[in-house]
Amino acid sequence: MERNQRKTLVGRVVSDKMDKTITVVVETKRNHPVYGKRINYSKKYKAHDENNVAKEGDIVRIMETRPLSATKHFRLVEVVEEAVII
């Protein structure tokens, strides 16, 4: 499989407490199968952050990769938007 055909997701970093690992929550909208109402779904993914550049609250792009651990199957591609510190 070519690298550009791998699944890429955009989400928000909710945890950066682990070394070289971030937790990213990806939010999607889907229609309810019976009622047709738009419903928000969210799913958490663990991603590899080699240089520990992503911080909590950042918007990041992650890409599917080979399994790096029991729960880590994504890696950080880029930080799309840094978190605003108030």
From Swiss-Prot:
GO terms for molecular function: rRNA binding; structural constituent of ribosome. GO terms for biological process: translation. GO terms for cellular component: cytosolic small ribosomal subunit. Pfam families: Ribosomal_S17. Keywords: Ribonucleoprotein, Ribosomal protein, RNA-binding, rRNA-binding. Part of the 30S ribosomal subunit. Belongs to the universal ribosomal protein uS17 family. One of the primary rRNA binding proteins, it binds specifically to the 5'-end of 16S ribosomal RNA. This is Small ribosomal subunit protein uS17. The lineage of its organism: Bacteria, Bacillati, Bacillota, Bacilli, Lactobacillales.
